[in-house]
């Protein structure tokens, strides 16, 4: 199953957009939720974030290989390693790993938990990569970013059971516009990952 047309366009380009270029839709989203005067469905507290679960068997310590790869190649590997896109607050992202520990004794578990378990089974020092991005935002803003990234990657490439939900003006965007924004977010997330380096969480570190 191919990725979205918007991601394929980036994969086939010679270089990615400069970090200096502002994304208009991202700025619109930021401005819309920055000083909201009405009570939002998920609350107005800026305590949410987005997160990605990545498979280290795909990234292969990507940040240590950036001198041998183009940024476009890095994006292809990064996107190929993502198996779950989420939104939450507190320890929501870490809770998936705890759930996987509990799923060891069950006969059946979700695709997401099974992939976490498969990563841990690979070898003793292999762990899940948990990347937090776009932090300190309200719930509806985080939900919209989640939906955009899922749209760009495509549900068949993920263990997410459903597509996300957009709020505000983004709820009226075309699918193409949403996917284009999601591709921008994935580039931003990849750049964070390359700067921070790869940190894996093993089953004994839960």
Q: Which stretches of residues belong to each language-model region?
A:
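Structure-specific nucleic-acid interaction/processing domains
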Residues: 4, 8-206
């Amino acid at each position: 199953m191919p990725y979205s047309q918007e991601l394929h366009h980036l994969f086939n380009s010679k270089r990615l957009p400069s970090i200096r270029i502002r994304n208009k839709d991202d700025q619109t989203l930021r401005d819309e939720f920055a000083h909201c005067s009405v009570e939002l469905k998920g609350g107005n507290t800026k305590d949410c974030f987005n997160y990605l679960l990545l498979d280290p068997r795909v990234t292969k310590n990507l940040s240590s290989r950036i001198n041998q790869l183009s940024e476009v190649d890095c994006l292809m590997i990064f996107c190929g390693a993502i198996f779950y896109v989420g939104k939450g607050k507190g320890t929501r992202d870490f809770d998936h790993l705890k759930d996987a520990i509990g799923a060891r004794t069950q006969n059946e578990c979700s695709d997401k938990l099974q992939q976490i378990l498969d990563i841990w089974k690979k070898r003793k020092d292999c762990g899940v990569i948990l990347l937090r991005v776009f932090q300190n935002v309200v719930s509806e803003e985080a939900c919209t970013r989640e939906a955009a990234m899922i749209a760009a990657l495509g549900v068949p490439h993920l263990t997410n059971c459903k597509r996300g939900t957009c709020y505000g003006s983004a709820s009226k965007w075309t699918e193409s516009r949403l996917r284009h924004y999601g591709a921008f977010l994935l580039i931003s997330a990849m750049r964070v990952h390359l700067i921070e380096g790869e940190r894996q969480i093993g089953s004994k570190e839960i």
